[in-house]
Swiss-Prot record:
This protein binds to 23S rRNA in the presence of protein L20. This is Large ribosomal subunit protein bL21. One of its GO terms (cellular component) is ribonucleoprotein complex. Keywords: Ribonucleoprotein, Ribosomal protein, RNA-binding, rRNA-binding. The lineage of its organism: Bacteria, Pseudomonadati, Pseudomonadota, Alphaproteobacteria, Hyphomicrobiales. Part of the 50S ribosomal subunit. Contacts protein L20. GO terms for biological process: translation. One of its GO terms (molecular function) is structural constituent of ribosome. HAMAP family: Ribosomal_bL21 (MF_01363).
Length: 102
């Protein structure tokens, strides 16, 4: 059985015991979080409009981490003008513990 969940403006296909990295969630390591379900596939397939009623996915927060550094470099030729900025996105690693149906 798998489900499609939405968090952080993105959709993820998950199954029980999957470990996924999502945008930062306000939860400490070891806490439980719940996600809404957009699509549920098992013995039958349920498609939500926009969500599947009564279905939810429960996950446990494994850790809070940060992504790889992304460099934004701008240069204006012949003007000795340069700007270099770095960015690291805050991420949360979660383990899917349960997919509950209606």
């Amino acid at each position: 059985m798998f489900a499609v969940i939405k968090t952080g403006g993105k959709q993820y296909r998950v199954a029980t015991n999957d470990v996924i990295t999502v945008e930062k969630l306000e939860a400490a390591a070891g806490e439980s979080v719940t996600f809404p379900v957009l699509l549920l596939s098992g013995e039958t397939t349920l498609v939500g409009a926009p969500l599947v009623e009564g279905a939810s996915v429960t996950a446990e927060v494994v850790e809070q981490t940060r992504g790889e550094k992304v460099i934004a470099f701008k240069k204006r030729r012949r003007q000795n003008s340069r700007r270099k900025r770095g960015h690291r996105q805050d991420l949360t690693v979660v383990r899917i513990t349960e997919i509950a149906t209606a």
